[in-house]
Amino acid sequence: MSVVRLRLFFSLLLVAVSFRASAALPNFDNLEARLKIRPEQKEQFDITVGSTKRALLAVGIAAIQFKERLTAELSKNNPDFRAFARANEDMVEQTRPLFKEAGDEWKRLYALLDDEQVEIAKSFLREHLGRFIQ
């Protein structure tokens, strides 16, 4: 594969990744309605949703930064393909603490929900965020 085709491929891939990351926010209002959140659960639900949104937005920002770094690397005559792996590792490490925090908040919320609500919430997470919680 020629360098030009390789650059084009990676550029298109990065554009797709950045658009996908920015469109990744699920409809948490819909989840709240499906869960029928009670007043004593509302505060933890809001905290959980906030921490989840922060983690997802961090992925979007990291994807944009990743795209910029890779675009700069691909513009070189001899791109360093190891830079792709380093940039990916940096992105994962940058967002890992936010996903841990979000996971901890979901566990706290589960403790307040009844069994049916927990199943609804877990189904929602698998459906909308499965790529992040595998």
For the regions a language model picked out, list residue spans one by one.
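N-terminal signal peptide c-region/cleavage motif recognized by signal peptidases
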Residues: 16-18
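Charge-rich (acidic/polar
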Residues: 3, 20-134
